Amino acid sequence: MDEEETAEINAQEQEVAGSAGEAAAGPSGAEVQPNDDSVAVERVIDVFEETAEMEAAMIERFFGPSGEVAEEGTLPVPGPSADGEGSANAGGERPSEEDIVLDDGTESDGSYNRPGSDMSLDSPNSEDDSDVEAMPRWMIPQNRLRFAVDMMVSQARNQDGGIAALLNRDNFLQRVRSMVFSQERRRSRNSDEVSPEAEDDELPEHPPPPPPRPPIDIDMEEGVHFDTNLPAEHSYFGPNLNRVPGVNYQEVGSTHHMLIFLHQYILFPGEVLPFMIDGSLFDDDMSGLDGLIFAVAFPLMKPPEDSKKLYGVTCQIYEKGDNGRHLTFYKSRALQRIVINCSDIKGLPQYIARNPTNKCHSKVKILPEYFLPEPLKCIDMGSMSRFRDIPSMRDKYLRYQISSTPWPVEVCQEYAYEDIVERARKKLEVHKIDTMPKCPIQMSFWLVRNLHLTEKMMSQMFLTDSVNLRLQLIGGILKEETLFYCRYCNSSLAYCSDLFAMSKHGVQTQYCNPGGYIHETNTVYRVISHAIGYSGEPSTRFSWFPGYQWHIILCKFCAQHVGWEFKAVEPNLAPKMFYGLAGSSVRIGKAGDSATVNGNNFVVRNMLRVISEGME
């Protein structure tokens, strides 16, 4: 809508107000607004439909007539159904190679300036407090359009400019998107809890899998390769950290009384949890030089059948230091899985990342870890075991062993884990990870952290007491291609095959910012082209990776924070650039996954990507 049309609408508004002013005036002479806003709503809807027609013309340019497929195999165009809901034909073509190239890192295209964003590494605030001020240009779901417009019209009547100001096209689209996405955000946390049956009813067919992408080999980059020991040391806490000795494992099945906190992420035994907290909460409980053991529970993982129980891990502090602001830096390591009865909790538990101020204690029970060795180990003959190390004799030796047992081949293979470990090792070689533990119990947790499973699968892995079952579940997903999706709008961001280890602890590590907020970060070589925008300015302050500057990245569609871009500032440092995706803002899904967020699917997202690029 140009300036002349806006001026004409303003003149019409003034004329209508002048003619109706005397009849509608109150005792003070001020105009009394009518109760029925239907006329104004319809006028705003007309402006939106005018904008939608422009976007539909853009769709027709790329995809053919609205509602029809231009050519066989191309993406269909969604249109309103009879009941007003947006719908789309299933199917679609594979994304082009241009969609899967490396991001060129330019900041002029698709940048979002959000001063004071609380997702910076040096921000003291929580991500849940952020607000979106700018929205990308894409369609609004029809089933929530009228509700958003009703709210806008009622607000606009009490503001300067009235309805005419609402009808400015850019202002209108921005505000409607803001309202709709505020609803999307409130529902996004439950996106992974949609039942498979409901998903199948909504989308009967799966989109096609994405095409293969050219691999990236970090070893081919020139320069000095980054020392992966540095992030594991969490050196951004400063040099004033003192070692706290002592690693204590509690007896399985025993009950202990200890300090407990809550955490928004699932921690597995072996993971490092850095945090910043008031040291007075721990000083009274620390005895001598022994590290304090406390409990961390995960309220978001509470199973429906165990509504009165919390699951978590015990953690032991192994380093601490003062930051000079009445807060203490701590580094702890998760040791064992635990279960807590909610009736045993004394006090109000608080999140460890939200600057807790009160102590909360409870009884915790140490959960067991059952591991059954391979069935053939019990009949292993020492004189012939040497043949297992000869590749040409290994299969013959295995068949000989199986023939001498009462169990069928399927049973032996079901409980054999060496093949699963070998397949996992080969898959992780691509990520440059060579720190796999040898202990089966520790290895099962290590694989869960580094193979990137869905949240539902991770919860299932955590709750099982059988190491063998945990490894079997891991073996079942090794061949699946998975992606990172935006948790808010379901846009694809990056491929899990592009993960690599910037820390010796693996591809997924938790880091803490100066405000005490803990970010679960996944490091990837690259993101899908045109999937991200930028916010704010690059900075090296409090960088988790020494020698790199960080820059906040946002989802290109919904403008929500999804992570950071890291660029080398020191010469000859490799890799030159990589990305850290925030675990709280992304979810893991299969390639071509039909899982939806509020009814928007893979096909619509790829269509909107083209529209967004064209309108910019």
UniProtKB/Swiss-Prot annotation:
- Bias-annotated ranges (Pro residues): 206-215
Please list the GO biological process terms of this entry: protein ubiquitination
Q: Major location, coarse class? A: nucleus
Question: PTM comment for this protein?
Answer: Ubiquitinated.
- Residues in domain Lon N-terminal? 257-482
Alphabetically sorted, this entry's keywords are: Metal-binding, Nucleus, Ubl conjugation, Ubl conjugation pathway, Zinc
From what superkingdom does this record's organism come? Eukaryota
Which compartments is it annotated to reside in? Answer: Nucleus
What's in the GO CC field? nucleus
Which InterPro entries would you find in this protein's record? Answer: CULT, Lon_prtase_N, Yippee/Mis18/Cereblon
An annotated Gene Ontology molecular function: metal ion binding
Q: Which family does it belong to?
A: Belongs to the CRBN family.
Q: What is this protein called?
A: Protein cereblon
Organism (species): Drosophila pseudoobscura pseudoobscura (Fruit fly)
Annotated gene: ohgt
